[in-house]
């Protein structure tokens, strides 16, 4: 009797992990997995390479290979920078500050046409230190590249995250929640060893 009991206990101990693995595998492949995403921002698929967008930084062609390897927070502006646009730039600055010891891994940018930057730059420089400006040489090209990745660039205010290799990987649009953005950036920095 005790031999049978020991056998059943051993059999149970052996079969439970197999049963759990089998059920979880079936659960996953039948599509019952989680439907929510982990990050707040929207993933850009396929990612965009900044080097293909005909951009200038400091009056020179934007060459990712010669740039400092840092993560980038980029706001694209087409016409004017209204209240929501200014709020997005403000949130980007505050989130960068809240990254504390990791804040040196990020640089903040505003991208717009040369004519628009002439209007925007003086007021933004006086209010937001360490803000960099990217000139968009070909606005139609930039818009079409973003449309290929299913992103309507100027539908609402935006904030994009680009990795240190120049790939635009995440975007946020509309009213951006700074706390959720901060959580996303912390996850990115924790997972990344570059930049």
Go through each PLM region and give its residues:
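Short, internal strand/loop/helix patches
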Residues: 109, 121-156
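Structural beta-sheet core signal
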Residues: 75, 108-111, 161
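N-terminal "domain-start" segment that seeds a small globular fold
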Residues: 15, 22, 31-66, 86-87
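Thiol-/selenol-based redox modules, centered on thioredoxin-like
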Residues: 155, 161-195
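Structural microenvironment flanking redox-active thiols in thiol-disulfide oxidoreductases
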Residues: 83, 87-127, 143
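N-terminal Lys/Arg-rich, disordered targeting/topogenic segments
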Residues: 1-3
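Short active-site neighborhood of thiol/selenol oxidoreductases, capturing the structured segment around
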Residues: 65-88, 92
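Hydrophobic membrane-insertion alpha-helices, especially the h-region
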Residues: 8-28
């Amino acid at each position: 009797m005790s031999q049978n009991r020991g056998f059943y206990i051993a059999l149970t101990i052996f079969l439970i992990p197999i049963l759990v693995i089998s059920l979880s595998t079936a659960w996953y492949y039948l599509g019952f997995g989680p439907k929510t995403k982990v990050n707040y921002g929207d993933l850009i698929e396929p990612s965009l390479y900044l080097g293909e967008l005909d951009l200038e930084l400091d009056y020179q062609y934007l060459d990712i290979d010669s740039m400092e390897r840092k993560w980038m927070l980029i706001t694209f502006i087409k016409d004017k920078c209204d209240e929501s646009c200014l709020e997005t730039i403000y949130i980007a600055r505050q989130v960068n500050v809240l990254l504390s010891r990791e804040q040196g891994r990020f640089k903040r940018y505003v991208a717009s046409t040369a004519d628009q930057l002439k209007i925007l730059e003086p007021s933004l420089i006086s209010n937001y230190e360490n803000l960099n400006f990217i000139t968009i040489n070909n606005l139609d090209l930039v818009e079409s590249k973003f449309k290929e990745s299913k992103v309507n660039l100027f539908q609402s205010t935006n904030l994009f995250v680009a990795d240190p290799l120049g790939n635009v990987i995440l975007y946020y649009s509309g009213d951006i929640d700074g706390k959720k953005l901060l959580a996303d950036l912390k996850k990115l920095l924790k997972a990344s060893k570059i930049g």
